[in-house]
């Protein structure tokens, strides 16, 4: 039986199982699809998305993206269709802000991160696995204090789709 992967669109051979057909060509595609579907629609609807190489933002064609130039950003769906780079992220601004907690254990988060969940649009584990990003609506100025960074404009945040808390 030939199936088409829900994530990458490639066709793959699978053994027939009427109770549970395979939807993905690999575990990697299954995980990638799951992570893409963790991000809430309120973020997906913003035209502030870019691809990434490491923590550097790039456009869907692979050229550099700028956190201050909306002409270099794209829609979520355009970014997900692109194969440029090795990931994706969002540009902050226009009321979208992010608390960045570095060097923390997501299983034992700081109290401040837990308190922020009540106003969070979305929260996820950072790319290192040892940090948290908590996205909120705010136009307060950016700052850094006590090992916590708050960004509200002109900043790129690489996303993982690893929702926190699970």
PLM region descriptions:
Residues 31-166:
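Conserved phosphate/metal-binding and DNA-contacting active-site motifs used
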């Amino acid at each position: 039986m030939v199936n088409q992967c829900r994530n990458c669109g490639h066709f793959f051979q699978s053994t027939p199982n009427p109770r549970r057909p395979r939807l993905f060509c690999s575990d990697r595609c299954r995980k990638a699809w799951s992570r893409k579907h963790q991000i809430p629609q309120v973020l997906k609807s913003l035209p502030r998305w870019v691809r990434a190489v490491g923590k550097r933002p790039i456009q869907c064609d692979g050229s550099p993206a700028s956190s201050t130039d909306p002409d270099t950003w794209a829609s979520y769906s355009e970014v997900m269709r692109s194969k440029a780079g090795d990931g994706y992220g969002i540009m902050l601004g226009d009321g979208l802000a992010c608390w960045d907690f570095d060097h923390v254990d997501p299983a034992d988060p700081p109290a401040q991160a837990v308190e922020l969940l009540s106003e969070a649009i979305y929260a996820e584990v950072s790319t290192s696995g040892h940090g948290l990003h908590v996205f909120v609506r705010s136009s307060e100025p950016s700052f850094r204090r006590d090992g916590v960074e708050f960004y509200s404009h002109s900043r790129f945040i690489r996303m993982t789709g690893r929702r926190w808390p699970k």
